[in-house]
Amino acid sequence: PSWEPVLAPVIEEQWPRISHALEGQEYLPPAEDVCRALRMPLDEVRVLIVGQDPYPTPGHAMGMAFSTRPGVKPPRSLVNIYRELHDDVGINGREDGDLSAWADQGVLLLNRVLTVAPGQAGSHRRIGWEEITEAAIRALNRSPMVAILWGRDAQACERFLPDVPCIKSPHPSPL
């Protein structure tokens, strides 16, 4: 199944607010990557990892939570994720922050808010993205799937996934 029947009604409802908030503003990631995470077909999602919002550093955000463009040094949150992977299961992280290989294996890296003003984390909260990503998360309430919820914002999504096992822990940010 496609995301379209799930998301079209809420996008239609929220888009006027979102487009008004973004109009004439610089934002990250680039427009063509804003919904990149949702290019993964709905029925291919095996793991959901929920992020907060895109990296606010220009050149980092690429439309998938916690991931960067190839060749970009991993931000501190991702360094901590790589460290936990190594310490817990012996998997070494990449030299860069590109998590496309995870997405290729069915890991949906979805931020709750899909855009951010450069240098201003959290700047696009409450403009309509949360309603859209809530609809996407609710569509994933099925098995076989597991959700990884790092931090309070992500853990608030557990209520949208009553039939999905959820792994919860603090946000990997060092802040």
Predicted regions: what they are:
Residues 2-161, 165-175:
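A polyanion-binding, active-site-adjacent surface
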